[in-house]
Amino acid sequence: MKTTLIKVIAASVTALFLSMQVYASGHTAHVDEAVKHAEEAVAHGKEGHTDQLLEHAKESLTHAKAASEAGGNTHVGHGIKHLEDAIKHGEEGHVGVATKHAQEAIEHLRASEHKSH
């Protein structure tokens, strides 16, 4: 009985630690993808390519929202807001403003990997 209880506790603790690792790596992977696509959005925005800026900003937003659901912090939330603003302004043809918002999103998303508030 005592051995069985110890095995159950050990298995539970192991499962807890493994799930925490998956949780953390899922958040990080989505933030990394969000940053990658936001960087592409900025690069295209600087070239005046509105359609490509929008494509990458939308993909970045998808990953930023997934990162938020996986335990993102306030920086992820700010990044999401800037991506939404980038998309809004891009759709209105304001490529310069959209590019600035995409750049702000990158800064917040990168900061989210270093701080937990």
Swiss-Prot record:
Coiled coil: none annotated. InterPro entries: SmbP. It comes from the Bacteria. Residues 27-111 are annotated as: 10 X 7 AA approximate repeats. Disulfide bonds: none annotated. Residues 1-24 form the signal peptide. Keywords: Copper, Metal-binding, Periplasm, Repeat, Signal. Induction: By copper. Sequence repeats lie at residues 27-33, 34-40, 41-47, 53-59, 60-66, 72-78, 79-85, 86-92, 98-104, 105-111. GO terms for cellular component: periplasmic space. One of its GO terms (molecular function) is metal ion binding. It is found in: Periplasm. There are two separate and distinct copper binding sites, a high-affinity site and a lower affinity site, which display negative cooperativity. Is capable of binding multiple equivalents of a variety of divalent and trivalent metals, including Cu(2+) and Fe(3+) but also Mn(2+), Ni(2+), Mg(2+) and Zn(2+). Is able to bind up to six Cu(2+) atoms. It is proposed to be a metal scavenging protein that has a role in cellular copper management in N.europaea. Monomer. This is Metal-binding protein SmbP. It comes from Nitrosomonas europaea (strain ATCC 19718 / CIP 103999 / KCTC 2705 / NBRC 14298). The lineage of its organism: Bacteria, Pseudomonadati, Pseudomonadota, Betaproteobacteria, Nitrosomonadales.
